[in-house]
Protein backbone atom coordinates (compact mmCIF):
# COMPACT_ATOMS: atom_id res chain seq x y z
CA UNK A 1 0.00 0.00 0.00
CA UNK A 2 1.39 3.42 -0.96
CA UNK A 3 1.72 5.94 1.85
CA UNK A 4 -0.58 8.86 1.11
CA UNK A 5 -0.82 10.97 4.27
CA UNK A 6 2.23 13.08 5.11
CA UNK A 7 2.42 13.83 8.83
CA UNK A 8 4.50 15.58 11.48
CA UNK A 9 4.36 14.03 14.96
CA UNK A 10 4.78 16.14 18.11
CA UNK A 11 5.27 13.91 21.14
CA UNK A 12 6.49 13.62 24.74
CA UNK A 13 7.61 9.97 25.14
CA UNK A 14 6.42 8.52 27.55
CA UNK A 15 5.56 4.86 27.43
CA UNK A 16 2.31 4.90 25.47
CA UNK A 17 3.92 7.38 23.07
CA UNK A 18 6.30 4.58 22.05
CA UNK A 19 3.41 2.58 20.62
CA UNK A 20 2.06 5.66 18.83
CA UNK A 21 5.48 6.43 17.33
CA UNK A 22 5.74 2.83 16.12
CA UNK A 23 2.37 3.11 14.40
CA UNK A 24 3.25 6.49 12.86
CA UNK A 25 6.51 5.07 11.53
CA UNK A 26 5.24 1.78 10.16
CA UNK A 27 1.55 2.11 9.29
CA UNK A 28 1.70 1.81 5.50
CA UNK A 29 -0.87 4.57 4.99
CA UNK A 30 1.35 7.18 6.69
CA UNK A 31 4.51 9.04 5.67
CA UNK A 32 6.15 10.44 8.80
CA UNK A 33 8.31 13.44 7.83
CA UNK A 34 9.41 14.86 11.19
CA UNK A 35 9.24 14.11 14.90
CA UNK A 36 9.35 16.91 17.45
CA UNK A 37 9.53 16.59 21.21
CA UNK A 38 8.01 18.64 24.00
CA UNK A 39 8.16 18.64 27.78
CA UNK A 40 5.23 16.73 29.22
CA UNK A 41 5.45 13.23 30.61
CA UNK A 42 9.03 14.10 31.61
CA UNK A 43 11.45 16.94 30.81
CA UNK A 44 12.14 17.77 27.18
CA UNK A 45 15.70 16.53 27.52
CA UNK A 46 14.32 13.14 28.52
CA UNK A 47 11.54 13.06 25.93
CA UNK A 48 14.13 13.88 23.27
CA UNK A 49 16.46 11.17 24.52
CA UNK A 50 13.60 8.68 24.54
CA UNK A 51 12.49 9.55 21.02
CA UNK A 52 16.07 9.25 19.73
CA UNK A 53 16.38 5.88 21.46
CA UNK A 54 13.26 4.68 19.69
CA UNK A 55 14.47 5.90 16.30
CA UNK A 56 17.77 4.11 16.89
CA UNK A 57 15.91 0.97 17.97
CA UNK A 58 14.03 0.97 14.64
CA UNK A 59 17.06 2.16 12.63
CA UNK A 60 14.99 5.08 11.36
CA UNK A 61 16.47 8.22 9.81
CA UNK A 62 13.40 10.40 10.44
CA UNK A 63 14.68 13.84 11.56
CA UNK A 64 13.92 14.88 15.13
CA UNK A 65 13.85 18.36 16.65
CA UNK A 66 13.77 19.19 20.35
CA UNK A 67 11.02 21.54 21.42
CA UNK A 68 9.81 23.57 24.36
CA UNK A 69 11.26 22.86 27.79
CA UNK A 70 8.46 24.59 29.69
CA UNK A 71 4.84 25.56 29.10
CA UNK A 72 4.19 29.07 27.79
CA UNK A 73 3.43 30.67 31.16
CA UNK A 74 3.63 27.97 33.83
CA UNK A 75 6.21 25.68 35.41
CA UNK A 76 6.21 22.14 34.08
CA UNK A 77 4.17 19.54 35.95
CA UNK A 78 5.26 16.18 34.56
CA UNK A 79 4.03 12.59 34.85
CA UNK A 80 7.21 10.84 35.94
CA UNK A 81 5.10 9.21 38.66
CA UNK A 82 3.42 7.26 35.83
CA UNK A 83 6.19 6.75 33.27
CA UNK A 84 9.18 6.47 35.60
CA UNK A 85 12.03 8.91 36.14
CA UNK A 86 13.41 8.44 32.62
CA UNK A 87 10.00 8.46 30.96
CA UNK A 88 10.44 4.98 29.51
CA UNK A 89 11.29 2.72 32.40
CA UNK A 90 11.38 -1.00 31.79
CA UNK A 91 13.62 -1.56 28.76
CA UNK A 92 17.38 -1.25 28.30
CA UNK A 93 17.96 0.56 25.01
CA UNK A 94 21.30 0.35 23.20
CA UNK A 95 23.58 3.39 23.45
CA UNK A 96 23.81 5.58 20.36
CA UNK A 97 25.28 8.87 19.17
CA UNK A 98 22.19 10.37 17.58
CA UNK A 99 21.46 14.04 18.12
CA UNK A 100 18.43 16.23 17.42
CA UNK A 101 18.44 18.88 14.73
CA UNK A 102 20.18 22.12 15.63
CA UNK A 103 16.96 24.15 15.33
CA UNK A 104 14.05 24.18 17.78
CA UNK A 105 10.90 22.22 17.08
CA UNK A 106 8.63 25.07 16.01
CA UNK A 107 11.17 26.22 13.41
CA UNK A 108 11.69 22.66 12.19
CA UNK A 109 7.92 22.28 11.80
CA UNK A 110 7.77 25.60 9.93
CA UNK A 111 10.52 24.52 7.54
CA UNK A 112 8.86 21.19 6.72
CA UNK A 113 5.45 22.82 6.24
CA UNK A 114 6.71 25.61 4.02
CA UNK A 115 8.68 23.21 1.82
CA UNK A 116 5.87 20.68 1.45
CA UNK A 117 4.11 20.55 -1.93
CA UNK A 118 0.70 20.46 -0.22
CA UNK A 119 -0.72 21.06 3.27
CA UNK A 120 0.34 18.50 5.87
CA UNK A 121 -1.31 16.94 8.92
CA UNK A 122 0.08 17.73 12.36
CA UNK A 123 -0.37 15.09 15.04
CA UNK A 124 0.13 16.22 18.63
CA UNK A 125 0.14 13.61 21.40
CA UNK A 126 1.68 15.76 24.13
CA UNK A 127 1.12 19.28 25.48
CA UNK A 128 0.47 21.80 22.71
CA UNK A 129 3.35 24.17 23.49
CA UNK A 130 5.27 23.62 20.24
CA UNK A 131 2.13 24.03 18.13
CA UNK A 132 1.29 27.27 19.93
CA UNK A 133 4.83 28.60 19.41
CA UNK A 134 4.58 27.80 15.71
CA UNK A 135 1.31 29.73 15.39
CA UNK A 136 2.63 32.63 17.48
CA UNK A 137 5.85 33.08 15.50
CA UNK A 138 4.71 31.94 12.04
CA UNK A 139 0.95 32.41 11.73
CA UNK A 140 1.29 32.15 7.95
CA UNK A 141 2.04 28.43 8.43
CA UNK A 142 -1.62 27.80 9.23
CA UNK A 143 -2.36 27.74 5.50
CA UNK A 144 0.05 24.82 5.14
CA UNK A 145 -1.62 22.74 7.86
CA UNK A 146 -4.30 20.42 6.52
CA UNK A 147 -5.53 19.64 10.01
CA UNK A 148 -4.33 19.09 13.56
CA UNK A 149 -5.15 15.73 15.13
CA UNK A 150 -4.51 15.77 18.85
CA UNK A 151 -4.72 13.49 21.83
CA UNK A 152 -5.96 15.65 24.63
CA UNK A 153 -8.91 17.05 26.47
CA UNK A 154 -12.17 15.55 27.63
CA UNK A 155 -15.86 16.30 27.41
CA UNK A 156 -16.22 14.89 30.92
CA UNK A 157 -13.85 13.97 33.70
CA UNK A 158 -10.10 14.50 33.68
CA UNK A 159 -7.12 12.30 34.47
CA UNK A 160 -4.77 14.93 35.90
CA UNK A 161 -7.26 17.00 37.86
CA UNK A 162 -10.94 16.14 38.39
CA UNK A 163 -11.83 18.02 35.20
CA UNK A 164 -8.63 18.34 33.16
CA UNK A 165 -6.80 15.87 30.93
CA UNK A 166 -3.00 15.84 31.32
CA UNK A 167 -1.83 17.15 27.93
CA UNK A 168 -4.13 20.17 28.08
CA UNK A 169 -3.59 20.81 31.79
CA UNK A 170 0.20 20.97 31.43
CA UNK A 171 -0.09 24.03 29.16
CA UNK A 172 -3.62 25.45 29.14
CA UNK A 173 -2.54 28.73 27.55
CA UNK A 174 -1.00 26.91 24.59
CA UNK A 175 -4.10 24.76 24.18
CA UNK A 176 -6.39 27.80 24.36
CA UNK A 177 -4.38 29.52 21.63
CA UNK A 178 -4.50 26.44 19.41
CA UNK A 179 -8.27 25.97 19.76
CA UNK A 180 -8.75 29.67 18.91
CA UNK A 181 -6.45 29.47 15.88
CA UNK A 182 -8.96 28.50 13.22
CA UNK A 183 -7.11 25.28 12.39
CA UNK A 184 -9.20 22.26 11.49
CA UNK A 185 -8.91 20.20 14.69
CA UNK A 186 -9.77 16.60 15.47
CA UNK A 187 -9.73 16.06 19.24
CA UNK A 188 -9.22 12.51 20.50
CA UNK A 189 -9.73 12.98 24.21
CA UNK A 190 -10.41 10.79 27.20
CA UNK A 191 -13.94 10.12 25.98
CA UNK A 192 -12.45 7.70 23.45
CA UNK A 193 -8.96 7.00 24.79
CA UNK A 194 -10.32 5.57 28.02
CA UNK A 195 -12.15 3.03 25.85
CA UNK A 196 -8.96 2.11 23.96
CA UNK A 197 -7.95 -0.65 26.35
CA UNK A 198 -5.65 -3.48 25.33
CA UNK A 199 -6.47 -6.58 27.33
CA UNK A 200 -3.94 -8.55 29.39
CA UNK A 201 -4.30 -11.41 26.92
CA UNK A 202 -3.38 -9.13 24.01
CA UNK A 203 -0.45 -7.63 25.92
CA UNK A 204 0.92 -11.04 26.83
CA UNK A 205 1.02 -11.99 23.14
CA UNK A 206 3.20 -9.01 22.22
CA UNK A 207 6.62 -10.65 22.86
CA UNK A 208 5.90 -13.34 20.29
CA UNK A 209 5.19 -10.79 17.54
CA UNK A 210 8.61 -9.21 17.00
CA UNK A 211 11.34 -7.29 18.83
CA UNK A 212 9.07 -4.25 19.04
CA UNK A 213 6.45 -6.39 20.75
CA UNK A 214 9.05 -7.49 23.28
CA UNK A 215 10.10 -3.89 23.90
CA UNK A 216 6.54 -2.62 24.31
CA UNK A 217 5.66 -5.52 26.59
CA UNK A 218 8.58 -4.57 28.84
CA UNK A 219 7.55 -0.92 28.87
CA UNK A 220 3.91 -1.70 29.58
CA UNK A 221 4.99 -3.80 32.55
CA UNK A 222 6.18 -0.53 34.09
CA UNK A 223 3.33 1.70 32.87
CA UNK A 224 1.40 1.40 36.11
CA UNK A 225 1.54 -1.21 38.84
CA UNK A 226 -0.82 -4.00 37.94
CA UNK A 227 -1.49 -2.73 34.42
CA UNK A 228 -0.60 -6.07 32.87
CA UNK A 229 -3.37 -7.65 34.95
CA UNK A 230 -6.03 -5.07 34.12
CA UNK A 231 -5.05 -3.87 30.64
CA UNK A 232 -3.47 -0.70 29.27
CA UNK A 233 -5.25 2.35 27.85
CA UNK A 234 -3.60 3.40 24.61
CA UNK A 235 -4.32 7.12 24.82
CA UNK A 236 -1.82 8.42 22.27
CA UNK A 237 -2.36 5.60 19.80
CA UNK A 238 -5.93 6.83 19.25
CA UNK A 239 -4.67 9.88 17.36
CA UNK A 240 -2.76 7.65 14.95
CA UNK A 241 -5.72 5.29 14.64
CA UNK A 242 -7.98 8.16 13.58
CA UNK A 243 -5.60 9.02 10.74
CA UNK A 244 -5.77 5.49 9.35
CA UNK A 245 -9.21 4.27 10.44
CA UNK A 246 -11.42 7.32 11.04
CA UNK A 247 -14.55 5.18 10.66
CA UNK A 248 -13.76 3.66 14.07
CA UNK A 249 -14.57 6.99 15.74
CA UNK A 250 -17.82 8.85 16.24
CA UNK A 251 -17.17 12.59 15.93
CA UNK A 252 -19.28 15.62 16.72
CA UNK A 253 -18.63 19.21 15.66
CA UNK A 254 -18.40 21.27 18.84
CA UNK A 255 -17.17 24.56 20.19
CA UNK A 256 -14.25 23.81 22.53
CA UNK A 257 -12.79 26.36 24.93
CA UNK A 258 -9.89 25.82 27.31
CA UNK A 259 -10.15 27.20 30.83
CA UNK A 260 -6.96 29.01 31.87
CA UNK A 261 -7.99 30.91 35.01
CA UNK A 262 -9.87 28.62 37.35
CA UNK A 263 -8.28 27.70 40.65
CA UNK A 264 -9.66 24.18 40.35
CA UNK A 265 -10.54 24.03 36.65
CA UNK A 266 -7.49 25.34 34.75
CA UNK A 267 -6.79 23.02 31.83
CA UNK A 268 -10.40 21.89 31.48
CA UNK A 269 -11.69 21.61 27.93
CA UNK A 270 -15.21 23.02 27.86
CA UNK A 271 -16.84 20.95 25.11
CA UNK A 272 -20.18 22.50 24.18
CA UNK A 273 -21.88 19.34 22.92
CA UNK A 274 -25.39 20.81 23.08
CA UNK A 275 -24.48 24.22 21.63
CA UNK A 276 -25.54 26.14 24.73
CA UNK A 277 -22.84 28.80 24.31
CA UNK A 278 -23.96 29.75 20.82
CA UNK A 279 -20.41 29.70 19.47
CA UNK A 280 -19.41 28.21 16.11
CA UNK A 281 -17.79 24.79 16.24
CA UNK A 282 -13.99 24.83 16.19
CA UNK A 283 -13.24 21.12 16.56
CA UNK A 284 -14.40 17.66 15.62
CA UNK A 285 -14.55 15.90 18.98
CA UNK A 286 -14.32 12.11 19.18
CA UNK A 287 -16.98 10.85 21.57
CA UNK A 288 -17.17 7.10 20.91
CA UNK A 289 -14.86 4.35 19.67
CA UNK A 290 -15.40 0.99 17.99
CA UNK A 291 -13.27 -0.84 20.54
CA UNK A 292 -13.16 -4.19 18.74
CA UNK A 293 -12.20 -2.48 15.50
CA UNK A 294 -9.51 -0.49 17.30
CA UNK A 295 -8.00 -3.61 18.81
CA UNK A 296 -8.03 -5.32 15.42
CA UNK A 297 -6.24 -2.34 13.87
CA UNK A 298 -3.62 -2.33 16.63
CA UNK A 299 -2.90 -6.01 15.98
CA UNK A 300 -2.59 -5.30 12.26
CA UNK A 301 -0.28 -2.32 12.59
CA UNK A 302 1.99 -4.03 15.12
CA UNK A 303 2.45 -6.81 12.58
CA UNK A 304 4.10 -4.26 10.23
CA UNK A 305 6.65 -3.25 12.86
CA UNK A 306 10.05 -4.99 12.87
Swiss-Prot record:
Keywords of the record, alphabetical order, are: Glycosidase, Hydrolase
CDD domains (UniProt xref): nuc_hydro_IU_UC_XIUA
Active-site annotation:
235
The cross-references to Pfam families, in alphabetical order and at most eight, read:
IU_nuc_hydro
One MF annotation (Gene Ontology) recorded for this entry: purine nucleosidase activity
- Please state what class of enzyme this protein is: hydrolase
Q: Which GO terms describe its biological process?
A: purine nucleobase metabolic process; purine nucleoside catabolic process; pyrimidine nucleobase metabolic process
Q: Which GO terms describe its cellular component?
A: cytosol
- Coiled coil residues, start to end: none
InterPro entries attached here? Inosine/uridine_hydrolase_dom, IUNH, Nucleosid_hydro_RihC_nonspecif, Ribo_hydro-like
Q: Does the keyword Disulfide bond apply?
A: no
Q: What is its EC number?
A: 3.2.-.-
Q: What does this protein do?
A: Hydrolyzes both purine and pyrimidine ribonucleosides with a broad-substrate specificity.
PANTHER family to which the protein is assigned, alphabetical: INOSINE-URIDINE PREFERRING NUCLEOSIDE HYDROLASE (PTHR12304), NON-SPECIFIC RIBONUCLEOSIDE HYDROLASE RIHC (PTHR12304:SF15)
The record's comment on protein family reads: Belongs to the IUNH family. RihC subfamily.
Family annotation (NCBIfam families): PRK10768.1
What's the protein called, per UniProt? Non-specific ribonucleoside hydrolase RihC
This chain is encoded by the gene named rihC
